[in-house]
Amino acid sequence: MAIDVKAIEEHIRGILIALGDNPEREGLKNTPKRVAKMYEEVFKGMCYSNDEIAEMFNVTFEDDLCINDNENDMVFMKEIEIFSHCEHHLALMYNMKVAIAYIPKKKIIGLSKIARIADMVGRRLQLQERIGSDIAEILQKVTDSEDVAVIIEGEHGCMTTRGIKKPGTKTITTTLRGKFNTDPIVSNKLMMLYTK
């Protein structure tokens, strides 16, 4: 699905009029075009399904990997910074830090691909909970591992700049699949690494 930049421009112009401003005045003349271009960039992830993102980043390494299926060795990355926009208010979700872990089976994925998956999933109208489950689903598809964990901490503009107006409020969500959800030793190891 392609983003309709022209339609966004027209609607932003309409919003400016509805707000009581003049879209032809100097400071706003190019605003609809700039906003449409920005939306095309920040919502790029909406152009792709989880399957398409998995295919896009499906570069794995298998030849040099010696894995014992009984092991609980994990790959763990944290402090992956992303942003997103909440689907309820279109408000920015910011200061988002993502931690991702998986237990390799037969394939490992390049570290930069993990960060790129998180970034692409964030570039949608989202819920923080869904960002975690989307990342987990994609990583499961790419690595063929059921054992995936995603922890996200972030701030939400809909909490900090409107309504209750509580700046600094952080939301933490967890998505735990496979052993991360069923094996206390694995989940404890995850939390130890996360809080380190």
From Swiss-Prot:
<keyword id="KW-0862">Zinc</keyword>
<dbReference type="GO" id="GO:0006729">
    <property type="term" value="P:tetrahydrobiopterin biosynthetic process"/>
</dbReference>
<dbReference type="InterPro" id="IPR043133">
    <property type="entry name" value="GTP-CH-I_C/QueF"/>
</dbReference>
<keyword id="KW-0479">Metal-binding</keyword>
<dbReference type="InterPro" id="IPR043134">
    <property type="entry name" value="GTP-CH-I_N"/>
</dbReference>
<dbReference type="InterPro" id="IPR018234">
    <property type="entry name" value="GTP_CycHdrlase_I_CS"/>
</dbReference>
<protein>
    <recommendedName>
        <fullName>GTP cyclohydrolase 1</fullName>
        <ecNumber>3.5.4.16</ecNumber>
    </recommendedName>
</protein>
<dbReference type="GO" id="GO:0003934">
    <property type="term" value="F:GTP cyclohydrolase I activity"/>
</dbReference>
<feature type="binding site">
    <location>
        <position position="86"/>
    </location>
    <ligand>
        <name>Zn(2+)</name>
    </ligand>
</feature>
<keyword id="KW-0342">GTP-binding</keyword>
<dbReference type="GO" id="GO:0005737">
    <property type="term" value="C:cytoplasm"/>
</dbReference>
<dbReference type="InterPro" id="IPR020602">
    <property type="entry name" value="GTP_CycHdrlase_I_dom"/>
</dbReference>
<dbReference type="Pfam" id="PF01227">
    <property type="entry name" value="GTP_cyclohydroI"/>
</dbReference>
<comment type="subunit">
    <text>Toroid-shaped homodecamer, composed of two pentamers of five dimers.</text>
</comment>
<dbReference type="GO" id="GO:0005525">
    <property type="term" value="F:GTP binding"/>
</dbReference>
<dbReference type="GO" id="GO:0008270">
    <property type="term" value="F:zinc ion binding"/>
</dbReference>
<dbReference type="InterPro" id="IPR001474">
    <property type="entry name" value="GTP_CycHdrlase_I"/>
</dbReference>
<feature type="binding site">
    <location>
        <position position="89"/>
    </location>
    <ligand>
        <name>Zn(2+)</name>
    </ligand>
</feature>
<keyword id="KW-0554">One-carbon metabolism</keyword>
<dbReference type="GO" id="GO:0046654">
    <property type="term" value="P:tetrahydrofolate biosynthetic process"/>
</dbReference>
<comment type="similarity">
    <text>Belongs to the GTP cyclohydrolase I family.</text>
</comment>
<keyword id="KW-0378">Hydrolase</keyword>
<comment type="pathway">
    <text>Cofactor biosynthesis; 7,8-dihydroneopterin triphosphate biosynthesis; 7,8-dihydroneopterin triphosphate from GTP: step 1/1.</text>
</comment>
<keyword id="KW-0547">Nucleotide-binding</keyword>
<dbReference type="GO" id="GO:0006730">
    <property type="term" value="P:one-carbon metabolic process"/>
</dbReference>
<feature type="binding site">
    <location>
        <position position="158"/>
    </location>
    <ligand>
        <name>Zn(2+)</name>
    </ligand>
</feature>
